[in-house]
Amino acid sequence: MSRRYLLRACEASLRRLGTDYIDLYQVHERDGLTPMEETLDALDTLVRQGKVRYIGCSNHSAWHVMKALGISERRGLQRFVTQQIYYSLLDRDAEYELIPLSIDQGLGVLVWSPLAGGLLSGKYRRNVEPPAGSRQTTPWGEPPVYDRDRMYRIVEALAEVASARGTSPAQTALAYLLGRPAVTSLVIGARTEEQLANNLGCVEWTLDVEERARLDEVSAPLLIYPYWHQANTAPERLSAADEALLRPYH
């Protein structure tokens, strides 16, 4: 993400899009070989030139994001206003650091693969062969599944909640994320018009307290250190950002 690369890439994007500016320009991946200062200075130049309105990042760890925000503050540069992250009912790892960071620093969260690569679509059930041509029959390995029994428990609970409400598992999984703190939008990957229409239906309703509690419980992330210590020793001193992860544990 060198200065030369970013300036040239933005110009090429503007030509392809046939527009004068880009509303949100996000650094898609962390470049550990280019100084963050150089990357942010280039992005700041694009904003000041009027070619970009706002900047964001994607697939950064929390310390990378905070380092970038600190550099922007110290140097008077444009700061990231969004982060695009993987987050789903199946994988709530983002709640350890990335979601609390977004709440604390005022970043909007754009979620990619909110259906966990289709695993939460309702197509994949225990002891049932996946449909021919479905994504999980391809060599693509993201997101990784480390515990298939846990995955099926989540899928089964999701299907039960969806069936009781009369919605699809996919729509229910999307509605779950839309009700999570800091989440501002979902990047969906529907392949058909029918899938798209079904997915978009998630904005028309919200999960009730019991439904959300059921899904929270079955998908709860394991409390790793220092979070179990924080939940046990200082539960009355948690901020809103802390509560995004720790609320159910105290």
Predicted feature locations:
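Glycine/proline-rich, positively charged
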Residues: 1-93, 97
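Glycine-rich phosphate-binding active-site loops on the catalytic face of alpha/beta enzymes
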Residues: 184-195
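Glycine-rich beta-alpha junction loops
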Residues: 61, 87-91, 113-120, 176, ...
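Helix C-cap/helix->beta junction micro-motif
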Residues: 49-50, 105, 165
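Acyl activation and transfer enzymes in specialized metabolism, enriched
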Residues: 18-21, 159-175
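Terminal-tail/helix-coil boundary detector
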Residues: 128-160, 164, 179-183, 197-250
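Aromatic-lined glycan-binding groove of carbohydrate-active enzymes
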Residues: 94-133, 168
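Conserved, mostly hydrophobic/aromatic
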Residues: 13, 22, 35, 55, ...
